[in-house]
A protein has these predicted regions:
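Hydrophobic-face positions in mid-chain alpha helices that act as interaction patches
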Residues: 38, 223, 227-303
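Start-of-helix signal in alpha-solenoid helical-repeat scaffolds, especially tetratricopeptide repeats
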Residues: 93-95, 119, 126, 158, ...
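Residue-level signature for tetratricopeptide repeat
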Residues: 135, 216-218
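Conserved, well-structured interaction surfaces
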Residues: 72-143, 191-193
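Sec-dependent bacterial lipoprotein signal peptides
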Residues: 1-17
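Inward-facing hydrophobic residues that define packing positions of alpha-helical scaffold repeats
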Residues: 99-102, 179, 186, 232
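Short coil/linker segments at helix-helix boundaries
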Residues: 119, 142-180
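Membrane-proximal, proline-rich intrinsically disordered regions
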Residues: 17-58, 62, 232
């Protein structure tokens, strides 16, 4: 009887590995560079959707009372972070979703099979590191305290997520700790990048040029004034400007603009554009008669 039991146990032991190695139907476990690229694209797509909502927390725009989408946006405008409205998806969730995807790529892409000449393990990992840095940077400046050299070591920041662990309990790191992680990701990411400038149709991806732009912005917020200036001066000569005096000039905010360096953020929404109005404070900043930007950016619709 014992012998029969041993044989049965041995059969299960030998077969269990093969069973666990079976990929579930309809699922893809990334093993190739192209598959990790697709995974990272999910991270890119998760990142920018909240950006245009932040204008509602400034003095730039306000929701139109009575508009059909008014209730979807009013909580943002009045800084109501604990809204009873369950349809509101607050900005913190999108960057952390992007970070989840970047962590998946960072952990495993260097062992992936290179199945395309158009991408490399290094490029994909470099982009993932920079996207993770950008997401942490945005979160810190949304929910943490602004950087102050004298208190950053103790000022409350945001939780840092650099690994995939569904049981991990996240606690807020200090502002200095978050910046340390951001700079580490930027440094490693820039060392891995191989693409100087992405093609226009994939310009949401990080390149060597957009990585410089990101570090310049982070250095500025970190009050590294000289480093921020040096990085900006390194980049500016390769960035032409739109001449708004020409009829063929494009909107500098669009992906088609020759000014575009990184076209990642969603800066507007059809629903939001129709359900908000520009504040008098913002309009007052423009010379409405002579400023070319005014005619390009604003249109009167009766609201």
């Amino acid at each position: 009887m014992k012998r029969i039991l041993y044989i049965i146990c041995s059969i299960f032991a030998l077969s269990s590995c093969n069973y666990l190695d079976i990929v579930p139907t309809g699922k893809v476990i990334p093993e190739k560079v192209t598959e990790f690229r697709a995974l990272l694209t999910n991270g890119y797509s998760a990142f920018p959707r909240y950006k245009y909502l932040l204008s509602l927390r400034s003095d730039e725009v306000m929701p139109i009372v009575g508009d059909s989408y008014y209730m979807d946006y009013i909580d943002f405008a009045i800084w109501q972070d604990n809204s009873p409205n369950t349809t509101v998806n607050y900005p913190w969730s999108s960057p952390y979703k992007a970070i989840f995807y970047t962590n998946s790529v960072i952990e495993d892409v260097m062992s992936a099979e290179e199945d395309t000449e158009e991408d490399s393990r290094e490029q994909v990992k470099g982009e993932a590191l920079l996207l993770r840095a950008y997401a942490h940077f945005d979160l810190l400046n949304l929910y943490g305290k602004p950087y102050k050299p004298e208190s950053a070591i103790s000022d409350r920041g945001i939780p840092i997520a650099t690994q995939i662990d569904i049981e991990q309990k996240y606690e807020a790191a200090t502002v200095e700790e978050v910046y340390k992680q951001i700079f580490a990701d930027i440094k490693e990411g820039r060392e891995l990048l191989q693409v100087e400038q992405q093609a226009r149709n994939v310009q949401y991806r990080f390149s060597k040029r957009s990585a410089i732009a990101l570090e310049a912005r982070v250095r500025l917020y970190h009050q590294d004034w000289e480093d921020a200036l040096a990085l900006a001066e390194e980049l500016i000569p390769s960035c032409p400007l739109e001449n708004l005096n020409e009829e063929t000039a494009g909107d500098p905010a669009l992906i088609t603009s020759k000014e575009a360096i990184l076209s990642l953020e969603v800066i507007g929404s059809y629903y939001l554009n129709g359900g908000m109005h520009i504040t008098s404070q913002l309009l007052g900043k423009y010379n409405q008669a002579g400023d070319k930007r005014f005619g390009m950016y604003f249109k009167e619709n009766g609201n």
